[in-house]
């Protein structure tokens, strides 16, 4: 019955877990923070000198000047020049959490900005080098954020917070930088595909990339599950059909964390999916090392988006 054993079904229906508990057990492993956001006082009306710290309006997430301080654990691979291209600031989610945001200006006048939702067990500090390299190679700017409880973001990680966090990032990207939806590519990796699919199912954008995606929390915990239960967490499989933007799905055939079958199932359920990238022999965390990864992304962005075909 739906791929679950009798004992598993009895356990589920007699003591069904809530989505939050499934999410917490399956997904969230925030690392020790590898960075901090340091407020920089702005000049007062008289020019020299600093305005009171309150003028930074950090609690509201309004524009202010912030400096990125990386620890050694961030393992930054570039020079101070590249570090200076990174802008950081906090914003606030609808659930009241401070959400740390990062904007990497890789290419002057870039046509697209990638809103990147990263995977598990990393934060913005650890991802900063990757963002610089990816944006430079794709000729896109990169905007990212940390989930509640990750990096310098406050609160605790949860499914509901994931959705509020990406909403806050989306609004910050649009209002602070004036980026229109048709210039935003939503990119989710692993657990980051959860907020990405949710946002893409509600807003149209230039494109969507799902990198090592999961279909749902229950299907990760119980691989034979065929049905989405009311207590399931991260139900990407039920939302992906609502996406109206072009979707590129990328998955490694030897993924040891989220089985390759998840990528296949989402591809089959998504009417806006383009030709996927199945990376033969790749696992969960090494797809970026294969040459076809960048090749497929470049072709998707340069040739397959509606604005490029016009």
UniProtKB/Swiss-Prot annotation:
Enzyme Commission number(s) of this protein: 3.1.2.22
Post-translational modification: Palmitoylated on cysteine residues located in a cysteine cluster at the N-terminus which promotes membrane localization. Palmitoylation is required for post-synaptic localization and for depalmitoylating activity towards DLG4/PSD95.
Catalytic residues, chain numbering: 190 (charge relay system), 255 (charge relay system), 284 (charge relay system)
Regulation of its function: Inhibited by palmostatin-B.
Residues where Phosphoserine is found: 307
Any one cellular-component term (Gene Ontology): membrane
Biological process according to GO: negative regulation of NLRP3 inflammasome complex assembly; negative regulation of protein localization to microtubule; positive regulation of protein localization to endosome; protein depalmitoylation; protein localization to membrane; regulation of postsynapse organization
Membrane-related topology note: Lipid-anchor
UniProt keyword Membrane present: yes
Keywords: Cell membrane, Cell projection, Endosome, Hydrolase, Lipoprotein, Membrane, Palmitate, Phosphoprotein, Postsynaptic cell membrane, Synapse
Entry keyword Iron-sulfur: no
Signal peptide: none
Compartmental location: Cell membrane; Endosome membrane; Cell projection, Dendritic spine; Postsynaptic density membrane
GO MF, one annotated term: palmitoyl-(protein) hydrolase activity
Top EC class, one word: hydrolase
InterPro entries: AB_hydrolase_fold, Hydrolase_4
Predominant subcellular localization, coarse grouping: membrane
Catalytic activity reported: S-hexadecanoyl-L-cysteinyl-[protein] + H2O = L-cysteinyl-[protein] + hexadecanoate + H(+)
Reported function: Hydrolyzes fatty acids from S-acylated cysteine residues in proteins. Has depalmitoylating activity towards NRAS. Has depalmitoylating activity towards DLG4/PSD95. May have depalmitoylating activity towards MAP6.
Family of this protein: Belongs to the AB hydrolase superfamily. ABHD17 family.
Full protein name: Alpha/beta hydrolase domain-containing protein 17A
């Amino acid at each position: 019955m739906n791929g679950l054993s009798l004992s598993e079904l009895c356990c589920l229906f007699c003591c069904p877990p809530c989505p939050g508990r499934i999410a917490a057990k399956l997904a969230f492993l925030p690392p020790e923070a590898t960075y901090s956001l340091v407020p920089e006082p702005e000049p007062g009306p008289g020019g020299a000198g600093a305005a009171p710290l309150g003028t930074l309006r950090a609690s509201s997430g309004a524009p202010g000047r912030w400096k990125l301080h990386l620890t050694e654990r961030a393992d930054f691979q570039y020079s101070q020049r590249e570090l200076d291209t990174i802008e950081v600031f906090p914003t606030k989610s609808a659930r009241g959490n401070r959400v740390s945001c990062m904007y990497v200006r890789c290419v002057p006048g870039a046509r697209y900005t990638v809103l990147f939702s990263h995977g598990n067990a990393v934060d913005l500090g650890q991802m900063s080098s990757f963002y610089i390299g990816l944006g430079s190679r794709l000729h896109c700017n990169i905007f990212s954020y940390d989930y509640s409880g990750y990096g310098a973001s406050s609160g605790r990680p949860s499914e509901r917070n994931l959705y509020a966090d990406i909403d806050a990032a989306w609004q910050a990207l649009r209002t602070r930088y004036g980026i229109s939806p048709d210039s935003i590519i939503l990119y989710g990796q692993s657990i980051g595909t959860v907020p990405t699919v949710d946002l893409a199912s509600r807003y149209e954008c230039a494109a969507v990339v799902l990198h090592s995606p999961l279909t749902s929390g229950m299907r990760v915990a119980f691989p034979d599950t065929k049905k989405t239960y009311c207590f399931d967490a991260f139900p990407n499989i039920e939302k992906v059909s609502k996406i109206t933007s072009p979707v590129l799905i990328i998955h490694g055939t030897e993924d040891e964390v989220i089985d390759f079958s998840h990528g296949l199932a989402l591809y089959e359920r998504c009417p806006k999916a383009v030709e996927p990238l199945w990376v033969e022999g790749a696992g969960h965390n090494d797809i970026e090392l294969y040459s076809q990864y960048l090749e497929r992304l470049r072709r998707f962005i340069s040739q397959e988006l509606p604005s490029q075909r016009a």
